[in-house]
Amino acid sequence: MTVKTTVSTKDIDEAFLRLKDIVKETPLQLDHYLSQKYDCKVYLKREDLQWVRSFKLRGAYNAISVLSDEAKSKGITCASAGNHAQGVAYTAKKLNLNAVIFMPVTTPLQKVNQVKFFGNSNVEVVLTGDTFDHCLAEALTYTSEHQMNFIDPFNNVHTISGQGTLAKEMLEQSKTDNVNFDYLFAAIGGGGLISGISTYFKTYSPTTKIIGVEPSGASSMYESVVVNNQVVTLPNIDKFVDGASVARVGDITFEIAKENVDDYVQVDEGAVCSTILDMYSKQAIVAEPAGALSVSALENYKDHIKGKTVVCVISGGNNDINRMKEIEERSLLYEEMKHYFILNFPQRPGALREFVNDVLGPQDDITKFEYLKKSSQNTGTVIIGIQLKDHDDLIQLKQRVNHFDPSNIYINENKMLYSLLI
């Protein structure tokens, strides 16, 4: 049997009909804060408000619903860092199918619990592997051994067609408001979302520039399309943006992206964290790291989008509240507002007061101080964290620290040491 490897607008239109009573029509909102910040019109497609809080339900339901009754009776499997798993679980419950869902051990607990909630007794969750790619290998082996049906999170034309319904929905909404998009920003993990969206836009909104956004620590599509002109597997990836941390994109999504995507942006994970905090405080939007990628990329494109009309897909809002401390720390590090040092303190009364008076600036704040006094030594080792009001104060701070202790270690520049603090 020949496996279909292309996606058409007809496929997306058919998927749209399958999904119209299943998925929520999520809002397309003009965002006044971002529009003012970037001197353009910025619209947000709020897939974080979908039933499973991400766009993944679209692709999962479409891919499962086209299976034959015989195939459905054998059960389904999937591998996912979280959102695709929730879409599969929701669908399994809706269609009363048995599903075995494989998730990386590193998946945030919030996403694991949501999968169990949406799937209930129809779903078994298996945590395995440190990355999506390791998890995928386990899932494929299990699927083959048990003769079940694997629902690919991105490298499947039915999954891609389902994700593409987001574009059809978006363009219908924009037509109602008489809006034409100059730029569209969307996250790339394995490439299913950007493939579906770009397929529809290239036919029905061909002047819109399609910009794919990846975390800088997992830019597998950029490395494949732009650097190597073939699908490559990244040897190492940063897993922080878990919803978009994929070492190898799909063969199908690679071909579609190569044809349709106009440009790629790699966003530092720290910048994503700053965006998450900004969206929460300014817009009351709870975005997960992958969901914030599209908005983060606007900073890279600020000169291009001035005076234009832009849409960003907020692809997901499944953020674990327990990660907020790390998100804040990564943001402060990226913004050069928080700094850690290892110092040798003289073991005598008044040494700390001397440090405060001689080293700290008038607006600097000590956020961490760890010190263990050793009576057998003249000095003791101190780990100290200092938060600045203005990152431009860093140069003078480091000069004062060096004067206080020339042998100090600046932890921010040592990734291994810094990882012990957050």
Curated annotation (Swiss-Prot):
Its cofactor is pyridoxal 5'-phosphate. Belongs to the serine/threonine dehydratase family. The keyword Lyase applies. Pathway: Amino-acid biosynthesis; L-isoleucine biosynthesis; 2-oxobutanoate from L-threonine: step 1/1. Keywords: Amino-acid biosynthesis, Branched-chain amino acid biosynthesis, Isoleucine biosynthesis, Lyase, Pyridoxal phosphate. The gene is ilvA. This is L-threonine dehydratase biosynthetic IlvA. Its EC number is 4.3.1.19. The keyword Ubl conjugation does not apply. It comes from the Bacteria. GO terms for molecular function: L-serine ammonia-lyase activity; pyridoxal phosphate binding; threonine deaminase activity. PROSITE patterns: ACT_LIKE, DEHYDRATASE_SER_THR. It catalyses: L-threonine = 2-oxobutanoate + NH4(+). InterPro entries: ACT-like_dom_sf, IlvA, Ser/Thr_Dehydratase, Ser/Thr_deHydtase_PyrdxlP-BS, TD_ACT-like, TD_ACT-like_sf, TrpB-like_PALP, TrpB-like_PALP_sf. It comes from Staphylococcus aureus (strain MSSA476). Gene3D superfamilies: 3.40.50.1100, Biosynthetic Threonine Deaminase, Domain 3. Pfam families: PALP, Thr_dehydrat_C. Homotetramer. GO terms for biological process: isoleucine biosynthetic process; L-serine catabolic process; threonine catabolic process; threonine metabolic process. Residues 339-413 form the ACT-like domain. Pyridoxal 5'-phosphate binds at N83, G189, G190, G191, G192, L193, S315. The modification N6-(pyridoxal phosphate)lysine is found at K56. Coiled coil: none annotated. Catalyzes the anaerobic formation of alpha-ketobutyrate and ammonia from threonine in a two-step reaction. The first step involved a dehydration of threonine and a production of enamine intermediates (aminocrotonate), which tautomerizes to its imine form (iminobutyrate). Both intermediates are unstable and short-lived. The second step is the nonenzymatic hydrolysis of the enamine/imine intermediates to form 2-ketobutyrate and free ammonia. In the low water environment of the cell, the second step is accelerated by RidA.
